[in-house]
């Protein structure tokens, strides 16, 4: 390589280094800390928001307003489905409650699904109902209901076979005790009305 070529190469590298340093200086957007503190002290944030759409308050009715909760416990509900092949199908998970009407004093059992709050169990606790043990589990009970009103498509009620499962055998025992107490109360009310 000749001396001329070496000098040209050196000048090109120096000019490129100088240009990149200039670009770095131009693109640097950091301000000194003192300037930032001054600016921050002068600025007051405006965080007031107003709703763009005004809505009316809607009263939600659950048809449980005229009832007192006597008992409530978490459980998983199943119903026996015979079509197309006989099997237990999950109806929902949530809190099962015994509700007493303030006027008539009749007690019904109601269960709503957790997230949707859709009713998955709704019938009166009749003295004719028989709560039986589910085979192979000490945490579950089975009973046949002549008319369950939880299905919106069949408001006249439908006959169902239910199974309910609890987290512990103690909870299952509590449920059975309360169920039988409610049956006795409803039986006494039915005898008074006859």
From Swiss-Prot:
RanBD1 domain residues are 42-188
Q: Which GO terms describe its molecular function?
A: small GTPase binding
Which SUPFAM superfamilies does the entry mention? Answer: PH domain-like
Protein's name in the database:
Ran-specific GTPase-activating protein homolog
The record, for PANTHER family, names: E3 SUMO-PROTEIN LIGASE RANBP2, RAN BINDING PROTEIN
**To which species is this protein native?**
Dictyostelium discoideum
Task: Identify the domain of life.
Answer: Eukaryota
- UniProt record, GO biological process: nucleocytoplasmic transport
Q: Which family does it belong to?
A: Belongs to the RANBP1 family.
Compositionally skewed regions (Basic and acidic residues) per UniProt? 1-10, 18-27
Encoding gene (name): ranbp1
The record's annotation in InterPro entries points to: PH-like_dom_sf (IPR011993), Ran_bind_dom (IPR000156), RanBP1-like (IPR045255), RanBP1_RanBD (IPR045256), WH1/EVH1_dom (IPR000697)
Annotated region Disordered: the residues are 1-36
List, alphabetically, the Gene3D superfamilies matched: Pleckstrin-homology domain (PH domain)/Phosphotyrosine-binding domain (PTB)
A GO term from the CC aspect: phagocytic vesicle
